C-alpha cells in the first residue's frame, strides 16, 4: 500500500489519459475480461453513480481504464504496464488531500515508481486471498470490494 499527499509538481505533463463516459464501459469490460476473466459490469456503474471518475487511455500500444475517487484509484486495469502507469498518474493528479493506493502486489511492480515519484510512502498491508482462476491480474490494481 502507498499513502500520503501527492507532490503535484512531480505529476508528468501531457498524460495520454482522458475522462471516460458510459460508452467507455465496453472498453473497460474488454480489458477486465483479459486481466481478470470477467467484466466488472454493475460494479463499475455503481462506482460512477456514487461519484467516482472513469479515466481512459488507449493508443497503438494498448488500452486501459481507471476509476478514481478523490485521487485514490479504486481500480486500474490496462493491457500494458506503461498504460497502467499513466492511468495511475492520472488518478493521483486528481488528488484532493491524502490518497491511498492499495493492493500493490509483486505483480504490480509497475506501480512502485509512480507512487514513489508522487511522494507517497510505501507500507505493508494484509494479504489478498483469491480462489480459482482469476486471470493474470496484471497490470491491475483491484478494488477491495469488487476485486
Could you describe each region identified by the protein language model?
Residues 13-147:
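Intrinsically disordered, low-complexity, positively biased terminal segments
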Residues 1-14:
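Active-site-adjacent scaffolding segments
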Amino acid at each position: 500500500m502507498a499513502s500520503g499527499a501527492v507532490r503535484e509538481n512531480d505529476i508528468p505533463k501531457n498524460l495520454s489519459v482522458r475522462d471516460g463516459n458510459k460508452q467507455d464501459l465496453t472498453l473497460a469490460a474488454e480489458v477486465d475480461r483479459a486481466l481478470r476473466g470477467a467484466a466488472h459490469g454493475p460494479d463499475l456503474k455503481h462506482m460512477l453513480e456514487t461519484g467516482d471518475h472513469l479515466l481512459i487511455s488507449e493508443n497503438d500500444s494498448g488500452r486501459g481504464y481507471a476509476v478514481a475517487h478523490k485521487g485514490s484509484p479504486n481500480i486500474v486495469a490496462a493491457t500494458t504496464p506503461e498504460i497502467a502507469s499513466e492511468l495511475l498518474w492520472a488518478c493521483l493528479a486528481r488528488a484532493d488531500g491524502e490518497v491511498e493506493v492499495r493492493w500493490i502486489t509483486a505483480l504490480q511492480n509497475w506501480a512502485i515508481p509512480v507512487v514513489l515519484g508522487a511522494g507517497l510512502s510505501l507500507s505493508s498491508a494484509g494479504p489478498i486471498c483469491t480462489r480459482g482462476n482469476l486471470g493474470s491480474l496484471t497490470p491491475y490494481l483491484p478494488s477491495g470490494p469488487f476485486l
